[in-house]
Swiss-Prot record:
Domain of life: Eukaryota
Entries under InterPro entries matching the protein: Nucleotide-bd_a/b_plait_sf (IPR012677), RBD_domain_sf (IPR035979), RRM_dom (IPR000504), RRM_dom_euk (IPR003954), TIA-1_RRM1 (IPR034827), TIA1_RRM2 (IPR034830), TIAR_RRM3 (IPR034496)
Pathological association: Welander distal myopathy: An autosomal dominant disorder characterized by adult onset of distal muscle weakness predominantly affecting the distal long extensors of the hands, with slow progression to involve all small hand muscles and the lower legs. Skeletal muscle biopsy shows myopathic changes and prominent rimmed vacuoles. Rare homozygous patients showed earlier onset, faster progression, and proximal muscle involvement. Amyotrophic lateral sclerosis 26, with or without frontotemporal dementia: A form of amyotrophic lateral sclerosis, a neurodegenerative disorder affecting upper motor neurons in the brain and lower motor neurons in the brain stem and spinal cord, resulting in fatal paralysis. Sensory abnormalities are absent. The pathologic hallmarks of the disease include pallor of the corticospinal tract due to loss of motor neurons, presence of ubiquitin-positive inclusions within surviving motor neurons, and deposition of pathologic aggregates.
Subcellular location, record wording: Nucleus; Cytoplasm; Cytoplasm, Stress granule
Biased composition (Polar residues): 363-376
SMART domains the UniProt entry points to: RRM (SM00360), RRM_1 (SM00361)
Post-translational modification: Phosphorylated by FASTK; phosphorylation occurs after FAS ligation in FAS-mediated apoptosis and before DNA fragmentation.
Name of the gene this protein is made from: TIA1
Annotated keywords: Acetylation, Amyotrophic lateral sclerosis, Apoptosis, Cytoplasm, Disease variant, mRNA processing, mRNA splicing, Neurodegeneration, Nucleus, Repeat, RNA-binding
Name of the protein described by the UniProt record: Cytotoxic granule associated RNA binding protein TIA1
């Protein structure tokens, strides 16, 4: 029975910069892919490709998750692939009915799953809400471990809606799970910003930061920003190691396990619409053991980033709008003679604390430069001022 179910997807309206390797990387996050065949139209039309999965359920989940998603600035069209033999049967409407039934399933995203939760567990948890066509926990292909989220597909829309409403926040395996529609909402009308946004190329973005930088800044989601939303948006591009969201500021940071995955995410998500907001994506700040970002700053025209999870964005005044309280700020004085960002003396002490790295000359720079009499290697709240 499984062998008779379709496993190959048509992926169209692709950018000419998209490669088979990128398509495989994106679609393999949903399920193991057997192969990908890119078709380049010599007549000048947009390229398209066919992606074949090992199992029908993975192909169905990829259809739900990837149709309408932007890849390198273009909204791709995903559908079941048809063969010449199936096209001949269209007159009997059998193929049309089969395809329509597959597309009429309603897919629910289930996030924040405990590592021990299996496909059978989520299927059993959602079974009381109606007839389920498919359920699965997404696993990492390399380790075989759960990625912490999954999908449940219902035959009936109302069953899916009821499951989303009733199961959101419920406990499953020691964690409160999150639920939402797996498919995206209809795209909002393009704003002036989105229409005028320059499309980034992968080669340009991947070279903007050092190979050790795996952090993406995503800003502009001024309402509805959650960790679940960011995980759902960025998980197709690679393994996510950490997500930090700041809903009151409208931005988040997503750290991947590889520089290449982060670059693909920046290229694909920048300028797209999330929850009705056009988002901006840049490289996050590199940590202290990475190369000095000042040289990168001069190459790409962005100011030096601030904070351990800072972002390449705007000027110093703009950065002040985005940095949350309790994180590193542009300038510090020494303990005993410290200034806030407005330059007012805040603290007096008879003896300044020299810190564990006293005597080590820090690098000089426009941001975080040492003030007069400031001890080397001084830290504030655990963050170095260099």
């Amino acid at each position: 029975m499984e062998d008779e179910m379709p496993k190959t997807l048509y992926v169209g309206n692709l950018s000419r910069d998209v490669t088979e390797a990128l398509i495989l990387q994106l679609f393999s996050q949903i399920g193991p892919c057997k192969n990908c065949k890119m078709i380049m139209d010599t007549a000048g039309n947009d390229p398209y490709c066919f992606v074949e999965f090992h199992e029908h359920r993975h192909a169905a989940a990829a259809l739900a998750a990837m149709n309408g998603r932007k890849i390198m600035g273009k909204e791709v069209k995903v559908n079941w692939a048809t063969t010449p033999s199936s096209q001949k049967k269209d007159t009997s409407s059998s193929t049309v009915v089969s395809t329509q039934r597959s597309q009429d399933h309603f897919h629910v995203f289930v996030g924040d799953l405990s590592p021990e939760i299996t496909t059978e567990d989520i299927k059993a948890a959602f079974a009381p809400f109606g007839r389920i066509s498919d359920a699965r926990v997404v696993k990492d292909m390399a380790t075989g471990k759960s990625k912490g989220y999954g999908f449940v597909s219902f035959f009936n829309k109302w069953d899916a809606e009821n499951a989303i409403q009733q199961m959101g926040g419920q406990w499953l395996g020691g964690r409160q799970i999150r639920t939402n529609w797996a498919t995206r909402k209809p795209p909002a009308p393009k704003s002036t910003y989105e229409s005028n946004t320059k499309q980034l190329s992968y080669d340009e973005v991947v070279n903007q930061s050092s190979p050790s930088n795996c952090t993406v800044y995503c800003g502009g989601v001024t309402s509805g920003l959650t960790e679940q939303l960011m995980r759902q948006t960025f998980s197709p591009f690679g393994q996510i190691m950490e997500i930090r969201v700041f809903p009151d500021k409208g931005y988040s940071f997503v750290r991947f396990n590889s520089h290449e995955s982060a670059a693909h995410a920046i290229v694909s998500v920048n300028g797209t619409t999330i929850e009705g907001h056009v988002v901006k994506c840049y490289w996050g700040k590199e940590t202290l053991d990475m190369i000095n970002p000042v040289q990168q700053q001069n190459q790409i025209g962005y100011p030096q980033p601030y904070g351990q999870w800072g972002q390449w964005y705007g000027n110093a005044q703009q950065i002040g709008q985005y940095m949350p309280n309790g994180w590193q700020v542009p300038a510090y004085g020494m303990y005993g003679q410290a200034w806030n960002q407005q330059g007012f003396n805040q603290t007096q002490s008879s003896a300044p604390w020299m810190g564990p790295n006293y005597g080590v000359q820090p690098p000089q720079g426009q941001n975080g430069s040492m003030l007069p009499n400031q001890p080397s290697g001084y830290r504030v709240a655990g963050y170095e001022t260099q």
